[in-house]
Amino acid sequence: MKTNKYVEELQAKSTTELNETLVAAKKELFNLRFQNATNQLDNTSRIKDVRKNIARIQTVISQKAKAAN
């Protein structure tokens, strides 16, 4: 599945790379919300996808933090 490959890619990244990816995803979500509010967003399901990706990134960061302890 597509999500499994995405999670595997995330798990291969370092913590700093994950944090950079998280910041980029949050910026994208911010922009998507503004586009949605101004009726410029055609694909509204993209908001849901980005939110789920943010959760996946945060989960991998949490797993790496627990493994480090």
From Swiss-Prot:
GO terms for cellular component: cytosolic large ribosomal subunit. It holds the Pfam family Ribosomal_L29. GO terms for molecular function: structural constituent of ribosome. Transmembrane segments: none annotated. It comes from the Bacteria. One of its GO terms (biological process) is translation. Belongs to the universal ribosomal protein uL29 family. NCBIfam families: L29 (TIGR00012). This is Large ribosomal subunit protein uL29. It comes from Lachnoclostridium phytofermentans (strain ATCC 700394 / DSM 18823 / ISDg) (Clostridium phytofermentans). The lineage of its organism: Bacteria, Bacillati, Bacillota, Clostridia, Lachnospirales. The gene is rpmC.
